[in-house]
């Protein structure tokens, strides 16, 4: 059968176009399970992140910490909102039926979430580092308004990095009639040597997103953690706050969900020159892409499960759960001081009783006699 498209395609994309639709019953069963899992994940992600946004944004006192979480939840909500369309793509037999424009928008949301998540986690780690290493500076400059401005700058940077993926995203017909939504690196200005153009652009995209959205954020997070640990060790403090544990859990989930995707993206870039990697890259990318999508579903669960006595507090309200986790370090220190004051105040009656026990006990008859005699001598205890 002749090629149904006149668009110039890179070698890897040409092989993907020629892949036939599988008719194996076991593979179709896997497709059905995949559609079910993605459908449940999309519903769960929308509900979870919507609740987090509502509670943190409308029902909690606004702090720098809640500002970070608010923007992180917004990024996850955007990714979760795109999951139903990806589920529809799977349900109709891995064919994109929603047009080229929506293909570009849908894919851009995925990459926007990828960059925004990495940038926001970096900002959270740096904020924690400044609190510990430069407490006076943080006290004077660390405000909710500044945090919002930083988040807006990070969103702008994420949008800027997403533009190439929007530009090169395209719909490509397959030989079996299905439609792919993938990036066509020869869509704009292919140049005289198409193989060189494909190889250069594919490696540039894979390496740039691997560095900017994964390795650089992890380096910032790791260096910030080391700086904080050294400073706390110098002060003789090793106590870890709840929000620090929450950030650690989110970072672990970020690495587990996005790490495989970046590895396969690098394999895909390498597959342009190493043909033996092409089948592995084309088969593995859909699975690791789904895993990356699920990161937006996992994060809201971490907000709740890092809270102690989670089930008890869930009976009270989601707000109580989040307020116990998204607490500023200064608030925790203040709470600790208040608890110490209450403990000292409860110890006062005991000390008073001890002092009273040491004061000589006066019998009424002896006290009356002493007052009649007008003696200046204090009666002795008997």
Swiss-Prot record:
- Record PTM text: Phosphorylated.
In which domain of life is the source organism classified? Eukaryota
- Where is it located? Cell membrane
| An example Gene Ontology CC term for this record | plasma membrane
**What results from gene inactivation?**
Deficient mice are fertile and grew normally. Ear-swelling responses induced by hapten-specific IgE are less pronounced in deficient mice, giving 35-55% of the responses of normal mice. The reduction in cutaneous responses is associated with decreased infiltration of lymphocytes, eosinophils, and basophils and decreased production of macrophage-derived chemokine and RANTES at inflammatory sites.
Q: Which InterPro entries does its entry note? A: Formyl_rcpt-rel, GPCR_Rhodpsn, GPCR_Rhodpsn_7TM
For the Cytoplasmic compartment, the record's topological domain ranges are: 56-66, 127-145, 231-246, 308-357
State which residue ranges cross the membrane: 33-55, 67-88, 106-126, 146-167, 210-230, 247-268, 288-307
User: What does it do?
Assistant: Receptor for prostaglandin D2 (PGD2). Coupled to the G(i)-protein. Receptor activation may result in pertussis toxin-sensitive decreases in cAMP levels and Ca(2+) mobilization. PI3K signaling is also implicated in mediating PTGDR2 effects. PGD2 induced receptor internalization. CRTH2 internalization can be regulated by diverse kinases such as, PKC, PKA, GRK2, GPRK5/GRK5 and GRK6. Receptor activation is responsible, at least in part, in immune regulation and allergic/inflammation responses.
> What PANTHER family does the record point to?
CHEMOTACTIC RECEPTOR (PTHR24225), G-PROTEIN COUPLED RECEPTORS FAMILY 1 PROFILE DOMAIN-CONTAINING PROTEIN-RELATED (PTHR24225:SF72)
Q: What is this protein called?
A: Prostaglandin D2 receptor 2
Which species is this UniProt entry from?
Mus musculus
């Amino acid at each position: 059968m002749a090629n149904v498209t006149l668009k110039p395609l890179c070698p890897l994309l040409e092989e993907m176009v020629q892949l036939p639709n599988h008719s194996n019953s076991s593979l179709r069963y896997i497709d059905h399970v995949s559609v079910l899992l993605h459908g449940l994940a999309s519903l769960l992600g929308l509900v979870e992140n919507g609740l987090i946004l509502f509670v943190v944004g409308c029902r909690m006192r606004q702090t720098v910490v809640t500002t970070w979480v608010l923007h992180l939840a917004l990024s996850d909500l955007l990714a979760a909102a795109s999951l139903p369309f990806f589920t529809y793509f799977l349900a109709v037999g891995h064919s994109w039926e929603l047009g080229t424009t929506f293909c570009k928008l849908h894919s851009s949301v995925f990459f926007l979430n990828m960059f925004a998540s990495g940038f926001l986690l970096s900002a959270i780690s740096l904020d924690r580092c400044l609190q510990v290493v430069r407490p006076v500076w943080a006290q004077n400059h660390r405000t909710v308004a500044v945090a919002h401005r930083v988040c807006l700058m990070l969103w702008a940077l994420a949008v800027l990095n997403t533009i190439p993926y929007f530009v090169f995203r395209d719909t490509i017909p397959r030989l079996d009639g299905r439609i792919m939504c993938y990036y066509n690196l020869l869509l704009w200005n292919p140049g005289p040597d198409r193989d060189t153009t494909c190889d250069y652009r594919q490696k540039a995209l894979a390496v740039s997103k691997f560095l900017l959205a994964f390795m650089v954020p992890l380096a910032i997070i790791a260096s910030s953690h080391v700086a904080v640990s050294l400073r706390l060790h110098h002060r003789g403090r090793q106590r870890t706050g709840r929000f620090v544990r929450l950030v650690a859990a989110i970072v672990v989930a970020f690495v587990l969900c996005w790490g495989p995707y970046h590895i396969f993206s690098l394999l895909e870039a390498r597959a342009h020159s190493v043909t033996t990697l092409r089948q592995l890259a084309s088969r593995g990318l859909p699975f690791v892409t789904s895993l990356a999508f699920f990161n937006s579903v996992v994060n809201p669960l971490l907000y709740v499960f890092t809270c102690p006595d989670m089930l008890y507090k869930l009976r009270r309200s989601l707000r109580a759960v989040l307020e116990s986790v998204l607490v500023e370090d200064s608030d925790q220190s203040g709470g600790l001081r208040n608890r110490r004051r209450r403990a000292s105040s409860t110890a006062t009656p005991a000390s008073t009783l001890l002092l009273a026990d040491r004061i000589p006990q006066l019998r009424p008859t002896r006290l009356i006699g002493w007052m009649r005699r007008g003696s200046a001598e204090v009666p002795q205890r008997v």
